[in-house]
């Protein structure tokens, strides 16, 4: 089986739009006919609940998978996958015990950064996903380090606000540190999120990010749109909940850009 392309939505700044981005990227890729495995790497479980998976994953979840990858001789990553109601979309959900994972990973001695990589390798032996899309927690901790080591591309959503652009240099350093271990890791791009171009600070914020990251900002920006919060409240992905909303269409456009960055051809949209 082929190894999937692993896309990780990351930013240590809380509320920058990681889970919203991951939730929409998954459906937009699935709409194009790709098989997608979403993995919720955040103990807040926001991505899992968006897909109605709040009650799932008591036994099968990312916490168990990472503990078992170390402990079970016949570890089979595919056993931790749950099916969703959405075509082409499967999941590994988060669990509240994920809070324990940071210390648990610290305590494991050998190959401390390779646990998530081993999980993906194990899944690739039996399953055929085109993409894995990770949502991550708002830290620069050991779990995120493991996820970066297992990734091909990091996609960084940045909230278009003063707080959103302040202190972003740290994620760049974190990326550089990780790429010493994972030479294959690339920055897929920066997504400006919650953009309101009528506000003058929006343009300033975009300039600040351009100065810091250069030309890796995606052309497509995600506007402030109440349908994002509404769909999350209703525990449904934005792209099926409000398929014609402004943000949904922007996430689709963004996904086309992501596909061109990762070198996969855009497929005919199946609606
Ligand atoms: N385009 C948008 N328009 C309006 N609200 C948005 C938009 N994108 C995200 N939000 C809202 O902003 C909040 C933060 O977004 P989200 O949960 O995706 O960020 P996050 O980076 O995953 O946060 P955390 O760091 O806590 O995991 C949520 O309440 C979400 O509904
Ligand atoms: Mg989140």
Question: Language model features by range: what are they?
Answer:
Residues 1-271:
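P-loop NTP-binding core
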